[in-house]
């Protein structure tokens, strides 16, 4: 699962590594443009969905991996819960100026979290984003 389709570039890269990519975009114009670009590029294993990515996409869960390409104020529990055991969530978390890149792995016992340094992403929009 990718949260934040944007231009579709990351979804195109991910599509070369995995069988199927579900990518969520909250901005209608970006979703339509990315959908068109990906189709024209022959990336048939990418599905772009207009949705609030901070909620994830439960109907296609559980996921092996979730990549969030926008900075969040907190890690949305909704995304963690959609991970398969052994799955990983990569998400930038912090304030609007600076985030830390967080990797969450779901285990049989719960969740393990690692922090991997500073980064800066556009703000996550939606219910669990910056609104």
Residue ranges and their predicted role:
Residues 1-112:
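Conserved nucleotide-cofactor-binding alpha/beta core module
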Residues 113-126:
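Conserved histidine-centered catalytic loops in small-molecule metabolism enzymes
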């Amino acid at each position: 699962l990718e949260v934040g389709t944007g231009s579709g570039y990351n979804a195109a890269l991910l599509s070369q590594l995995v069988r199927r990519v579900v990518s969520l975009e909250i901005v209608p114009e970006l979703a339509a443009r990315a959908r068109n670009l990906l189709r024209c590029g022959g990336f048939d294993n990418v599905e772009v969905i207009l949705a609030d990515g901070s909620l994830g996409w439960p109907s296609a869960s559980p996921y092996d991996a979730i990549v969030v390409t926008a900075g969040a104020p907190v890690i949305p529990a909704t995304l963690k819960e959609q991970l398969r055991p052994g799955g990983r969530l990569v998400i930038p978390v912090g304030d609007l100026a600076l985030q830390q890149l967080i990797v969450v792995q779901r285990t049989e016992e719960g969740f393990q979290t690692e922090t991997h340094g500073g980064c800066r992403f556009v703000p996550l929009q939606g219910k669990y984003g910056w609104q």
